[in-house]
Structures are given as C-alpha cells and as structure tokens.
A protein has these predicted regions:
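Active-site helical microenvironments for divalent-metal-assisted chemistry
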Residues: 1-237, 241-258
Length: 258
C-alpha cells in the first residue's frame, strides 16, 4: 500500500483523482472476489513498473519473487496492443492473453483493472478514445471474463461498454426496456413469490432473486438471431440460491415438476 502510494506520488487520473486511487479500487474489486493476499498485493502494485520509476528488482526484494512475477505479468499484458476489430483477430488476441497468463491470478488482476477503467471511462474527454477502449473491452475482456467463468464481471464489462460502442442502439433498447419495465415489473415479483411458495411447500429454504436481462445481451439476440425485443421470452432472469449441492438438485427437481 505505502510503496504503491509513494511510487505513484502526485500522478493524477483523468478524473483528477490521485492515481493511487486506481490500484486501490482494483484491489477492492479483487478483495470482493475473496482472492488471496498475493493477488491483492499485486493489484496494489500492478502499475508501478509500467508507470513509475519502481523496478522489478525493488518489488522482488520487498515483496518476493512470486509477487514480482505477477506484477511483471500484468505489465506485459498491458503492453499488448489490440488494433484489429475483426472477430478472428479478437479471438487470436484473447488466446494470446490466456497463453501469457501462466498464473490465472494475473489475468484476474488485468480484468479488475479494466473493470475499474470502464467504471471511470466517462472522465476521458475524447469520445474516440472512449469508444476505442469500450470496443476493446467488448471484443477482448468481456469474452475473456466469460471464458474463465466470471459471469457477473462479463455482464458489467458489457453493460459499461455497450453505450460507447453502439450509442444509438443502446438508447433505443433502453427506451423500450423502460417501457416494458413499467408494464412488467409486477410479473417479476409474481414469479418470485410463486417460486418461493413452491419451495416452501417442498420444505426448501431458498432465496429467489430476479433481474432484468442486460441490454447488450438483448441487443445481440436482436442483431444476430433476428429476434425482436417483444418476442424475447427471457427478458427476466431468476436465480435460486440454496445452501448446498444437495439442495440445488432438489430445487431443480421441484422446478422441473412444477
């Protein structure tokens, strides 16, 4: 913490916040994922080699070889430049990132780094730069998050990128979703209540959560599957949270029998 704060010194973000606020936020994201201490330390240090006078040798001496290698790994991923917008090149670039991430924690730090940068993207003044970063996120980092099983991270990366890459489509879908939301919110609550009653009747203690599907996911169905928004049957997603694997199978059976 102290080493990173001193190394970044008076550096500023586009938001005019101290630069150190960025690695601190990245560390917070990874802490929320309950990752290990080495990963959190790497998050705090991840920009020091690239953006400050700190060296690999200094980090290795102070924090050990493992953390130094992880920080160096994040630095090398950051140095890669994605320049093509073709699907084939995007897939090749994703494969390259995976191949270079001999420790999956390095990739997780990079994904958390990108997530915080997307959360603060609006502070960048040039629209072309915002669009480029968002496009890269949509083509590279969101699919990577999905590939390693980080579904919620993927959803947020897609949601943050969508309005910058396809602003007109985003505005159109959001207007239609807001209209549908006003007319279907009661349906979501009714489904949750009905599911809770069914599980209670079968002596299962569960938590049922419902959410509206992500705008980008809906747009992909419209664009690539030619399914209009009004004809999409899964605008809501429901999650049933149980205590263990056995209850999970019991809950699945209850739903299938309903």
């Amino acid at each position: 913490y102290v080493f990173s704060m001193k190394a970044h010194g008076t550096q500023k973000r586009a938001s005019d916040d101290p630069y150190f606020s960025h690695p601190l936020e990245v560390a917070g994201i990874l802490t929320g994922m309950q990752l290990d201490c080495d990963t959190i330390v790497t998050a705090l240090l991840h920009d020091t080699i690239e953006d400050t006078v700190a060296t690999y040798e200094q980090i290795e001496e102070l924090f050990g070889t493992n953390i130094a290698r992880m920080v160096d790994g994040v630095t090398k991923l950051s140095e890669l430049e994605y320049t093509s917008e073709t699907l084939k090149q995007a897939e090749n670039f994703r494969k390259l990132l995976l191949a270079m991430s001999t420790d999956i924690r390095v990739l997780l730090v990079k994904l958390a780094d990108r997530l915080h940068n997307m959360r603060t993207l609006h502070h960048i003044q040039k629209s072309e730069k915002r669009s480029r970063i968002a496009r890269e996120t949509l083509d590279i980092y969101a699919p990577l998050a999905e590939r390693i099983g980080m579904q919620e991270l993927m959803n947020e990366l897609e949601s943050l990128s969508f309005p910058h890459v396809y602003p007109e489509a985003y505005e159109s879908i959001m207007k239609r979703l807001d209209y549908l939301h006003d007319n279907t919110e009661n349906i979501r609550d009714e489904v949750i209540n009905e599911l809770e009653k069914i599980f209670l009747k079968n002596h299962l203690e569960v938590e049922v959560v419902g959410r509206r599907k992500q705008p980008y996911s809906i747009w992909k169905k419209i664009t690539y599957r030619n399914v209009s928004l009004e004809n999409q049957a899964d605008l809501f997603a429901f999650r049933v949270i149980v205590d263990g694997a056995e209850d999970c199978y019991r809950a699945l059976g209850v739903i299938h029998d309903y």
